[in-house]
A protein has these predicted regions:
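Structural preference for solvent-exposed beta-strand-turn elements
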Residues: 1-370
């Protein structure tokens, strides 16, 4: 292999695969990135056996070929180079030689034959075109609710729900649930529900722009194609909890609040909440929402946020970080808080602005004992 590529083009693709590669791996080649030169491009790919990403950049290919090199080291080297052309070639001893301006590097590689094969499109698989900007918005509104506990594998991802008239994403960790849906016209036969693993959701978010996304299933993989790159992930083989009734529950105590004012108040009050629980007390009464937090070791904090609420008083405990996650993603000037009593879940929603297209975003949070 002997190629020349622009530093910026090569760096962009190497940066995107960094999240795929596992830093500590019992299989050495999984720490490597696959480089394949042919035609007028250099293909760049990485996998952890569950999630894979393939991209490419323009290149002048003097001699086609392939090699795998340390993804982390190659990225660090290319990032440090001056803005110039990068000359990469495989030498007779199997090592890779990299030159740029007055810099020269030699790197040990592993043969392409040892690199795992990547998922291909299944024959006859009909892709569905999804609006990229919509999918990116839904991920931003839900991904923080995905559980970090791999043991609860059926919660370790987001449920993607596709229908002819919309796209929805749902995530939960058992303590809170975030649901977001946007109307969209999809060329789809039957409605589709698939569980997208947490890591794949994060990597997809990095790829998404305003351009459409092509999605299809290939054997036991989910495949997303966007901007000339292909992200493939194994499906989660599990049953996502029934969420439909949960997001329909309504509280009779409804307050509308300024999102930024509430977010700032929660952030300040939570500074003196217990470090492990992050619990704060939320008290709703006529004209105001009162937030309090206390810790035997640190002290206590109190702040009120004005609201037009005129119902009966209610007090409930919430995890402050759960509230901040929603408030940071809601994107509207106003949000609504719906409560029933101190022992039932609360519902938060963005308040739609104007008559433009909006996201149906519902965030259900379980209460905490205080």
């Amino acid at each position: 292999m002997d190629i020349v590529a622009r530093k910026a083009d090569l760096l962009r693709e190497l940066q995107l695969v960094q999240g795929i590669v596992e830093r500590k791996n019992s299989i050495p080649i999984l720490s490597n990135v696959l480089l394949e030169a042919s035609g007028e491009s250099l293909a760049v790919a990485a996998t952890d056996l569950d999630v894979s990403l393939r991209g490419s950049c323009p290149a002048q290919v003097a001699r086609p070929g392939a090699i795998t090199l340390s993804a982390k080291k190659l990225y660090e080297i290319v990032r440090s180079l001056p803005d110039s052309d990068v000359h990469l070639r495989i030498e007779d001893d199997g090592w890779a030689s990299l030159d740029c301006a007055r810099s020269h590097f030699r790197m040990a590689g592993l043969p392409r034959e040892d690199f795992p094969s990547l998922p291909e499109a299944a024959a006859g698989a009909a892709p569905v075109e999804l609006p990229g900007a919509v999918l990116r918005d839904l991920i931003a509104r839900t991904s923080f609710a995905i559980t970090a506990e791999d043991a609860r594998y059926y919660l370790a991802g987001a449920l993607l729900v596709l229908s002819r008239d919309g796209v929805a994403l749902v995530a939960t960790d058992g303590h809170r649930l975030s649901y977001a849906r946007r109307a969209a016209k999809l060329k789809l036969g039957e409605a589709l529900r698939v569980l997208v693993p947490r890591k794949a959701v994060g990597e997809l978010q990095q790829l998404l722009q305003d351009e459409p996304v092509s999605f299809h299933q290939a054997q036991n993989h989910l495949v997303f194609s966007v901007g000339g790159r292909v992200l493939a992930s194994k499906m989660i083989d599990g049953q996502f909890p029934a969420y439909e009734k949960v997001i329909e529950l309504k509280g009779d105590k409804v307050a509308q609040l300024e999102r930024e004012a509430l977010m700032a108040a929660v952030r300040r009050v939570s500074l003196l909440s217990a470090e492990r629980s992050r619990a704060i007390r939320v008290g709703l009464q006529e004209g105001r929402l009162e937030l309090t937090a206390s810790s035997p070791e640190m002290g206590e904090a109190r702040e009120s946020v004005p609201t037009e609420y005129s119902g009966g008083p209610v007090e409930i405990g919430f995890n402050a970080q759960y509230l901040l996650d929603f408030l940071g993603s809601a994107g509207t000037a106003q949000v609504s808080l719906e409560l029933r009593d101190s022992e039932s879940q609360g519902m938060l929603r963005p308040v739609a602005e104007g008559e433009g297209e909006s996201t149906d975003h519902r965030y259900v949070v379980m209460p905490m004992r205080l």
